[in-house]
């Protein structure tokens, strides 16, 4: 059933504007857009504005698309007031803070949704369906390499590349494999915090022995988002390896964003708001917190 929701928006930059337009298309009315002019000298939203607009009697949910370092405080502010939250990735910049937000949402019986749009990418969803069928037959004899690189951008410089890019691919990984079954074998991040590599082993469960590699670079010469699949040769495994591009490229080699990824995540959030798929929603929030835990594990510089 379609409802006319009221919301507030924290941060009206590139992603904030995109989220606002998608929600407004679904008849969501934004009562207040908090941006730089609404901050006090300490960089926090002025208390008088919070008291005026951030109330569950006035709004149904909050959209948080402010700098990543503010996600935890704004999400906590809203969840404590009984307001559901749609927040850009990463959920927080510390694993403990991310878990705190998940627990707070459960305790207050409100929705916490992390906008990790790649999880709603139709290309990935199709890949995941077929890949999980393949490894059902192949057992644990596989290796995945997630690679995500793009040219320098001034956006998202308040966090390192792990919290900026790696969380995308960790969230994809966690939609296929259990967090409890994973072990980080190696994690290095460059001194300029623009490039990182992570190696994860699946150490428990049906796919124990499989390997997952992650490479991210936000100051690269190329623009690429791929998953490479490699199978160990056995009678059970497929006789081929392959790679999947999560985004098409234009004639200049630039990534073309798949619009249905954003559209699908907004539609799903609105389904959660009417009470549908609630258990899936809780698992997705926990997965987002687990992605932060992995992305903030003790690192080595290179």
What residue spans do the PLM features occupy?
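N-terminal Rossmann-like dinucleotide-binding module
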Residues: 1-43
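Beta-loop-alpha module in the N-terminal Rossmann-like domain of NAD(P)-dependent dehydrogenases
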Residues: 19, 43-104
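Contiguous beta-strand/loop segments that form the cofactor/metal-binding neighborhood of enzyme cores
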Residues: 158, 164-243, 267-276, 297-299
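A contiguous active-site-proximal alpha/beta segment in oxidoreductase catalytic domains
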Residues: 92-156
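A short helix->loop->beta-strand "cap" motif at the edges of active sites that frequently abuts
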Residues: 28, 81-83, 108-111
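Active-site loop of classical SDR/Rossmann-like NAD(P)-dependent oxidoreductases
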Residues: 18, 39, 223, 238-240, ...
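C-terminal helix-rich "cap/oligomerization" subdomain common to oxidoreductases
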Residues: 1, 9, 61-66, 110, ...
């Amino acid at each position: 059933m379609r409802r006319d929701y009221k919301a507030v928006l924290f941060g009206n930059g590139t992603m904030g504007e995109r989220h606002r337009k998608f929600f407004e298309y679904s008849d969501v009315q934004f009562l207040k857009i908090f941006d730089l002019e609404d901050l006090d000298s300490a960089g926090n939203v002025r208390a008088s504005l919070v008291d005026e607009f951030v109330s569950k009697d006035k709004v149904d949910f909050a959209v948080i698309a402010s700098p990543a370092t503010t996600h935890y405080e704004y999400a906590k502010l809203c969840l404590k007031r009984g307001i559901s939250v749609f927040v850009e990735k990463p959920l927080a910049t510390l694993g403990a803070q991310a878990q705190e937000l998940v627990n707070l949402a459960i305790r207050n019986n409100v929705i916490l949704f992390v906008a990790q749009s790649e999880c709603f990418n139709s290309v990935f969803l199709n890949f995941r369906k077929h890949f999980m069928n393949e490894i059902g037959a192949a057992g644990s004899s596989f290796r995945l390499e997630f690679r995500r690189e793009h040219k320098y951008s001034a956006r998202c410089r308040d966090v390192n590349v792990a919290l900026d890019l790696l969380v995308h691919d960790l969230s994809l990984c966690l939609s296929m494999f259990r967090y409890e079954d994973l072990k980080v074998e190696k994690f290095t991040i460059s001194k300029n915090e623009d490039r990182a590599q992570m190696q994860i082993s699946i150490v428990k469960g049906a796919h124990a022995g499989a390997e997952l590699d992650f490479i991210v670079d936000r100051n690269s010469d190329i623009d690429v988002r791929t998953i490479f699949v490699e199978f160990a040769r056995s009678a059970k495994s497929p006789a081929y390896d392959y790679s999947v591009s999560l985004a098409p490229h234009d004639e200049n080699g630039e990534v073309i964003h798949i619009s249905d990824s954003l559209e699908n995540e907004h539609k799903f959030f609105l389904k959660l708001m009417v009470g549908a798929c609630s258990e899936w929603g809780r698992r997705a929030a926990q997965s987002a917190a687990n992605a932060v835990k992995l992305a903030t594990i003790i690192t080595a510089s290179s």
